[in-house]
Amino acid sequence: MFDTSVFIYALGGEHPYRAPCRAIMSKGVEGLLAGEASIELIHEFAHVRARRGVDRRTAVADARHIADTSRLHTVERADVERALELWSEHEQLDMRDAIFAAQALNRQINVILSPDRGFDGIEGLQRIDPADDDAVASLIAA
């Protein structure tokens, strides 16, 4: 499961995560990395891009590209219920990330690709840092 930050860093300005996140996006486009994402990721991505001054046409084109190269999951009631539980149990987790974690867990997806340490410590969910080349390579090989 992708976290929004992978795409924000990949398409954003200079940052230590920019190159690893761009490489991940390339692997997704090439079909080497099966990308799972929440429909909420598209919303968050477009909102953040527009808020950072990217014109809407570009933000829409970028969001469509992500949607086209990811398997999108809608938010179901069970996801909301589980997200609320996760959010109450993990103080470091914000609510949108709790939704992403719940969606992953409810779909037996046990990995989230994210630099955000807020996902650490969630039972049944392993966070893989985009800058961890070996861990990312293991996803491609899987």
Describe these PLM feature segments.
Residues 11, 49, 123-126:
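Short, flexible helix/strand-to-coil boundary loops that buttress conserved ligand/catalytic motifs
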Residues 22, 44-71:
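Active-site-proximal, substrate-binding regions of enzyme catalytic domains
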Residues 30-32, 69, 89:
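Structured helix-beta-strand junction loops
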Residues 101-102, 106-142:
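Acidic, PIN/NYN-like endoribonuclease modules and their adjacent C-terminal/linker elements
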